[in-house]
């Protein structure tokens, strides 16, 4: 599946994956408000075998099929300074 990744200008390390380029209508209004204006970052072919830095590719694919988007939040800092 071809995916399109956008980063948030308001929330560091927060990304939205879309199944269709610039299809922001699938994103719920409250999430749009918090996320802010999306900035296009990357386009790539996502398969279950592909390695992603912070996400399970099968979970991302399932979310894209079910909702049309996938939200990637920043990793939790398990040991804050």
Curated annotation (Swiss-Prot):
SUPFAM superfamilies: YcgL-like. Pfam families: YcgL. Residues 1-81 form the YcgL domain. Gene3D superfamilies: YcgL domain. InterPro entries: YcgL-like_sf, YcgL_dom. HAMAP family: UPF0745 (MF_01866). This is YcgL domain-containing protein Tgr7_3126.
């Amino acid at each position: 599946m071809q995916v399109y990744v956008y980063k948030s200008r308001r929330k560091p390390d927060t990304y939205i994956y879309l199944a269709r380029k610039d299809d922001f209508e699938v994103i719920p209004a409250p999430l749009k408000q918090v996320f802010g204006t999306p900035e296009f970052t990357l386009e790539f072919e996502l398969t279950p075998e592909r390695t992603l830095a912070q996400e399970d590719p099968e979970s991302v694919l399932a979310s894209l099929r079910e909702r049309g988007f996938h939200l990637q939040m920043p990793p939790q800092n398990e040991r804050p300074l």
